Structure formats: C-alpha cells, structure tokens
Amino acid sequence: MKKRVYIETTVVSYFAARPSRDIIVASHQEATRDLWPDLTAEYETYISALVYEEAGKGDPDQAKMRLAAIEPFPMLDIDDEARFLAEKIIAGRGIPADYPEDALHIAVAAVNGMEVVVTRNFAHLNNPFTRRAVRRIVEGEGYVCPEICSPQELLEVDK
C-alpha cells in the first residue's frame, strides 16, 4: 500500500521555479525535481485547496507552471475540522500566529490521514522545535501527526 503524502506549496514552487544560480538553492531545486516522479509512482500524493490557491499567485507564467505541476494530484478539502485544528496549532504555539496558512497545511494533512507532509518551509514547518510542538498539539487533539520532512529526506527513504 502506498504511503499518503501531502505536498505543501514551497515544494511546488521549487519544482517549477527557474533554475537558480545560487548553488544551494539549485541543489534544493534538483532534489525536488528528483522526487517529483516518485510523487505519482511511489506515493498517494495530495494537495489542498490552499496549495492550489498559493500556487496560482505571483508571476502568471510561473503560476501556470505550478498549477500544471499539481494538476494530477487529488485536492483535499479544507473543512471546519481542519480549521479548528489549525487554530489549536496556533493557540498551542506550534506555528506562529502570523502564519495561519502553515498551520492549516498541517491540519488538513492530519485530519485527512496523511502520513507525511513534504515542505521546504524550514522557518515555520520543518525544524525540530516546530515538529515537536506540532506533534504534541496534533496528537493531543486525537489525530496522528504526519511526519514533516523535506524532499531530500523523502528521497532518502526511497533508497
């Protein structure tokens, strides 16, 4: 049975972005592009309406590329249950109140039984302090907390 994976908007942005001249950013883009075929072949991959909305913003040509990249993935609903959990994540200081969308990504994934959230957002999602706080809050609300990881980390699992 395939693992259920939720991809957050930063992953889509790195996948569809013009190649960077910055060597570190370019390596992140390459890892994200390396993972992309696995997202359809190896995993049940999902997005949410929030990912779709965020991917459609910005430069029209880039937005078109981002939206085309996520077109094959089923979209999860953002319901009251997810909104309530996102509020709990913020209230419990898992995610800063200034970034409610980040809490909503985690909440949508948890409510829908995703096993993994793949993100490039290290500031508010994928760092050891956030992961620990989010896990405590999500599990305290009775959900299984998805693992939060980068594309590189998920690629390592594939090896």
Question: Locations of the language-model features?
Answer:
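Short, flexible, glycine/charge-rich loop motifs used to bind or transfer phosphoryl groups or to couple energy/partner
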Residues: 35-36, 107-108, 138
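Short, well-structured N-terminal submotif of metal-dependent ribonuclease cores
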Residues: 1-47, 54-67, 73, 91-97, ...
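Short, charged/polar low-complexity linear motifs in solvent-exposed/disordered segments
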Residues: 31-32, 102-103, 144
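Active-site neighborhoods of divalent-metal-dependent phosphate/nucleic-acid chemistry enzymes
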Residues: 73-133, 155
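Short secondary-structure boundary segments
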Residues: 9, 49, 120-122
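Acidic, PIN/NYN-like endoribonuclease modules and their adjacent C-terminal/linker elements
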Residues: 2-4, 18-22, 26, 110-159
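General small-molecule cofactor/ligand-binding pocket signal
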Residues: 46, 76-77, 147-149
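Residues at the C-termini of beta-strands that transition into short coil/loop
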Residues: 49, 79, 152
